[in-house]
Curated annotation (Swiss-Prot):
Biotech exploitation of the protein: Fumagillin and its derivatives have been intensely studied for their potential use in the treatment of amebiasis, microsporidiosis and rheumatoid arthritis. They have also interesting antiangiogenic properties by the irreversible inhibition of human type 2 methionine aminopeptidase (METAP2).
Protein name (Swiss-Prot/TrEMBL): C6 finger transcription factor fumR
GO biological process: fumagillin biosynthetic process; positive regulation of fumagillin biosynthetic process; positive regulation of pseurotin A biosynthetic process; pseurotin A biosynthetic process
Compositionally biased intervals (Low complexity): 556-571
Source organism per UniProt: Aspergillus fumigatus (strain ATCC MYA-4609 / CBS 101355 / FGSC A1100 / Af293) (Neosartorya fumigata)
Length: 622
């Protein structure tokens, strides 16, 4: 056994051969040098160029350096030419061995490893290890001790400084294999957050403050030492980035965003009116300013119009936003008139009465503006409707004339004509009711404000002329339809005609007429009689309303006009001939000429109504 052992030691010292030793079933790499002794194990040795053999070595203790101990000198025996790894020194693998995931073997850290020497390439050693956390903390504390104090009480960090930098490296070098940092293969210049202030510069101080036992945040005392002047700590970064945030101590108009979300006051509902700047939009209003905003809008319950604190209307008289609803236009004509019983009561304060009268006048002025706007819209609709009614022709030529309308060309739009007439008549009735109320109370001031000026009067007359033209065209179609019926009644019944012959004889048809569940047949002449009666009644009613509106303010109220305006449409009788003449007294030249032209159109339309009525009666009597 001694001979074999000596032979093994001599072979390892001379050739530096590598042996693969299987200890307890686990394969490990060992290099046996001269004078070294191995524990008692059974192992197989493979030598270069020689046969393998089995041998058993029994010794009490090995003389080779163990992994858990380190010799006092890098090389225990100068005579023994052993590798550094066998002596227990920790070193980093070179770039080539590390990239191939192989073991890097070298005699010392400055020499070339065995694999690079065999391959004939340059061996680039890697750094020993990363800087330890204890060394980083100690260096940071030394830098912080040199920086000036920022003020306030600070807590000192207790760092163990018993070991120097070399001792620290030596301490970790013994157990380098078992440290988690040994698994990381990173250069030393890549500092992954060893400096506490490097990763917290962008964090608000309220988020980095320590929490108390009950979850409260203690921000009065910093938890760590102050950073040096050339480094930005979390507190300095927070002061720099949040220094522009408005504070309530500096200005009452700015908002304090440094407060928690639960301490921020909600924005008032009326704050959207103030848009002076972005800072004012983001800041709460003072109490006195919010009080002024609440007083800006005050609704008058009697009239439903928004008023200011002084009692005057805060709205402008222009634009479509001030349009009154139909219920306001059709209100009681005595809504603005003072009560007769109130005149017998003693007068109150003259200032209150003046404010009340001013508010009433403003309301009347707004009503007049709304009337003019509605008259303009109605005038446009009436003009378009007049152009949509086809002219009377022969055969099927009338179909092309009504191609631009939304209704069928075979059916006259009588229903749309009556709808627009009702809309126009309702608007004139509202104006006449206000005028009649002012005349009955002898309120000349209110009457002067409600009286229409010359452009408004021409607008009323223009709409009336469009209606008369529409009635005239419809009556011409009914007349032609009745004449054809009369001729067919002599030759035979109209029910015997087929569709082609009926369409050629009647290029236009009248709409259906129904009373509840009863519907009048389209071939009946009763339908023509009813339509002519409605047209005549509408013309008479509109004539009386226009005469009331066109009457000057100083003209006394005539009995016929006032009764017509108050009681509604008159009976179907002959139109009074002096109504328009009386209405023309005191008017301008343009209004007088327009009224004279309208009288001629009225006479022509009424004559046509009477002609159609006689034809319808003849058709009924057949």
């Amino acid at each position: 056994m001694d001979v074999n052992r000596k032979r093994m030691v001599r072979m390892a010292s001379a050739q530096r051969s590598e042996m693969l030793v299987r200890l307890s079933g686990k394969a490990k790499r060992w290099t046996v040098g001269g004078g070294g002794e191995v524990e008692t194990h059974t192992f197989h040795t493979f030598c270069a160029g020689q046969k393998s053999y089995k041998s058993v070595v029994r010794r009490q203790r090995p003389r080779i350096a163990r992994r858990d101990s380190r010799p006092s000198h890098p090389i225990a025996n100068r005579g023994m030419n052993m590798l550094v790894h066998d002596l227990g020194f920790s070193h980093r693998a070179c770039d080539r061995c590390h990239g191939q995931k192989l073991r890097c073997r070298r005699e010392n850290n400055s020499d070339t490893c065995v694999r690079c020497a065999r391959a004939g390439v340059r061996c680039t050693p890697r750094p020993m290890r990363l800087r330890s956390r204890a060394q980083s903390t100690k260096n940071t504390q030394q830098q912080q001790s040199q920086s000036p104090a920022n003020g306030g009480s600070t807590q000192q960090l207790h760092v163990n400084q018993e070991q120097g930098p070399n001792d620290t490296n030596d301490e970790h070098s013994d157990h380098f294999e078992y440290l988690p940092t040994s698994l990381l293969d990173m250069p030393t210049d890549l500092n992954m957050g060893m400096d506490p202030s490097s990763l917290q510069v962008d964090i608000h101080p309220a988020l980095t403050a320590p929490y108390g036992p009950e979850g409260s945040v203690h921000t009065s005392q910093p938890s760590g030492p102050q950073a040096p002047s050339h480094l930005r700590t979390a507190e300095q970064a927070g002061q720099t980035r949040w220094s522009d945030a408005p504070n309530l101590d500096t200005s009452d108009e700015l908002y304090d965003f440094s407060l928690p979300a639960t301490m921020r006051s909600s924005f008032p509902a009326t704050y959207h009116r103030h848009r002076a700047s972005l800072a004012r939009n983001m800041s709460p209003q003072p109490a006195h300013q919010q009080g002024r905003d609440d007083m800006m809008v005050d609704f008058d319950q009697a009239e439903g119009n928004p008023r200011g604190s002084d009692g005057k209307d805060s709205r402008a008289d222009s634009g479509y936003g001030n349009e009154l609803s139909p219920s306001d236009l059709l209100r009681s004509p005595y809504g603005d008139a003072p009560d007769s019983d109130s005149e017998l009561q003693p007068r109150g304060n003259s200032q209150d009465q003046g404010e009340q009268s001013n508010s009433i006048l403003d309301t009347r002025h707004q009503n007049m503006t709304s009337w003019i706007r509605r008259l303009s819209d109605t005038n446009v609709q009436l003009h378009q409707h007049m152009q949509s009614i086809p002219l009377v022709g022969t055969g099927k030529k009338t179909r092309g004339s009504g191609a631009g309308t939304s209704l069928s060309p075979m059916e006259l739009p009588v229903d749309s004509t009556f709808k627009l007439s009702s809309q126009y008549t309702g608007l004139l009735t509202s104006i006449c009711a206000r005028l009649q109320a002012c005349r009955s109370c002898n309120d000349s001031q209110a009457l002067a404000q409600l009286a229409l000026d010359q452009p408004s009067q021409l607008l009323v007359l223009s709409s009336y002329m469009c209606l008369l033209a529409s009635y005239d065209r419809i009556l011409q179609h009914i007349e032609a339809w009745l004449k054809v019926r009369l001729k067919m009644g002599v030759r035979g019944s109209a029910m015997t005609l087929d569709d082609d012959e009926s369409s050629s004889c009647f290029p236009t048809q009248l709409p259906s007429l129904a009373v509840g569940s009863f519907e009048v047949p389209k071939t009946s002449s009763i339908q023509s009689l009813v339509l002519t009666c409605i047209m005549e009644t509408n013309v008479m009613h509109m004539h009386s309303l226009i005469s009331e509106i066109m009457r000057p303010v100083s003209h006394p109220a005539t009995g016929s006009a006032s009764k017509t305006a108050a009681s509604g449409p008159p009976a179907a009788e002959k139109r009074p001939g002096n109504g328009a003449a009386d209405a023309g007294d005191g008017l301008s030249t343009v209004a007088k000429v327009t009224l004279q032209a309208i009288e001629a159109n009225e006479d022509s339309t009424l004559r046509l109504v009477h002609t159609v009525s006689r034809l319808a009666l003849q058709r009924v009597m057949l």
